[in-house]
Regions:
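Catalytic loop of the DD-peptidase/beta-lactamase superfamily, centered on the K-T-G motif
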Residues: 1-33, 118, 122-123, 163-176, ...
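Active-site-proximal loop and beta-strand segments within enzyme catalytic domains
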Residues: 14-15, 26, 37-152, 168, ...
Length: 434
């Protein structure tokens, strides 16, 4: 798999990504490898067994657990959530209509959150239940079943649903009924159970790449976000999905349950006309092939998982740096598996300008950009989208000064780009910086 290694090395060397782990499945063949480092401070190498925070890929485990409980007769997917969580309350009478299936498919009309309190995490057993109780003041943003609206909040409610209907904590149920039966013995939703020798550190690309002062963990948001796993163990998860519920003779889901999990329930929006949401999973096409996918991003970590079930191929990529070019990575490796010529990602031009921008200011960075346009057109990616990718990342992790400089530079280079102007407006509304 030298070509896979070439893609990974290009990302680590050219995109400021501290560490990256790749898992590839083709039929029953599995290839896993780590690249880069777990932390730029320790320089310990990433391996296929290094544990990464997965962010929203966690939701695919939640959905499988809920469907598993439905198989056991402990809940019905089309029953109202209130049937199993009678104390669940929103400040909107329509919430009484929300079904389990609607919550799983992000069609419940639930709002979302942009504050996970990573800087003030809760670790106790009651954290999830307290969070769900705190939603009593929230209102729906649409009628249940009306449209797709991605909601992390909805998956916290589903986590409590798993706990109530199983009689176990959310984390214990997932561990005993999904992770351990699949041999995913190092994987865990509990940060305190992450083996230190396998742990990875979150990083942020300013540029340059720095260690994040926050770690994305809060037990109140475990179901939506906090599974830790490795490329090696996630390949077991992928194989179970490709085999429709079975791994090495151990069945954790009925074959027919994948008709529910991968059913295209609702189009996600007009900007993605061929993308639909299933039960947690997203369904679209790539190169004319059906693709099942989920990705994730939180402070310092980014992940992506792609399954092409009709070809029995899949890829997972885990990075301990944001932003990371996950689409480029996944598309290049999937192309390889399909027998196509991959496009090796070019590093963003911002990578060669970040320290100039912070140390010497806008004008020198502009001059550097113009020079590279003339001399390095084949070496760098000059897409203005990179200013948005890095800018919004910096905004979300509250690195406002760096965000401001990045947006200013982008606007200087692309004065007619309304998206960059919008980034500056959002920054101004956040902190009053003009």
């Amino acid at each position: 798999m030298q070509e896979v290694d070439d893609v990974a090395h290009a990302v680590v060397n050219g995109f400021g990504v501290a560490g990256l782990a790749i898992g590839v499945v083709k039929g029953e063949q599995v290839y896993t490898k780590g690249f880069g480092v777990k932390s730029i401070e320790t320089q310990e190498p990433v391996t296929a067994n290094s544990l990464f925070h997965l962010a929203s890929i966690s939701k695919t485990f939640v959905a499988s657990a809920v469907v598993q409980l439905a198989e056991q007769g402990k809940l019905e997917l089309d029953a109202p959530i209130l049937t199993y969580l009678p104390d669940f309350i929103l400040d909107d009478e329509r919430y009484r209509q929300i079904t389990v299936r609607q919550m799983l498919s992000h069609t419940a009309g639930m709002p979302d959150t942009d504050d996970y309190c990573w800087d003030r995490p809760e670790y106790d057993d009651q954290a999830l239940e307290r969070y769900v109780r705190s939603l009593a003041h929230e209102k729906l943003i649409a009628a249940p079943g009306e449209k797709f609206a991605y909601s992390n909040i909805g998956y916290e409610v589903l986590g409590l649903l798993i706990a109530r209907t199983s009689g176990q904590s959310f984390e214990d149920y997932i561990e005993q009924h999904l992770l351990r039966p699949l041999g995913m013995n190092s994987s865990t939703f509990l940060k305190m159970d992450v083996a230190p020798e396998h742990a990875t550190t979150p990083h942020i690309l300013l540029p340059p790449t720095v260690v994040s002062p926050e770690y994305p963990y809060n037990r109140a948001h475990a179901p939506s976000s906090t599974l830790h796993s490795s490329a090696s163990e996630l390949c077991s998860w992928i194989l179970m999905n490709l085999n429709r519920g079975e791994l090495q003779g151990r069945r954790v889901l009925q074959t027919t349950s994948f008709e529910q999990l991968w059913h295209p329930y609702q189009q996600t929006g007009p900007s993605h006309p061929d993308e639909f949401v299933g039960l947690s999973w997203f369904i679209d096409t790539y190169r004319g092939q059906r693709r099942i996918r989920h990705d994730g991003v939180d402070t310092g970590f980014q992940s992506d998982m792609v399954i092409l079930p009709d070809h029995s191929i899949a890829v997972v990529a885990l990075a301990n740096t944001i932003p990371a070019p996950m689409n480029m990575i996944m598309n290049a490796i999937v192309d390889l598996l399909l027998g196509l010529e991959p496009s090796i990602p070019k590093p963003p031009v911002l990578m060669s300008m970040g320290t100039i921008l912070s140390a010497h200011g806008i004008q020198e960075a502009v001059d550097r950009y113009r020079h590279l346009q003339e001399t390095g057109a084949d070496q760098y990616d000059f897409d203005p989208e990179q200013f948005l990718d890095i800018g919004y990342t910096l905004l979300e992790v509250r690195r406002y000064d760096e965000c401001f400089r990045t947006a200013q530079l982008g606007l200087e280079l692309f004065p007619d780009a309304p998206e960059i102007a919008d980034l500056l407006k959002q920054l101004k509304s956040r902190v009053g910086k003009a």
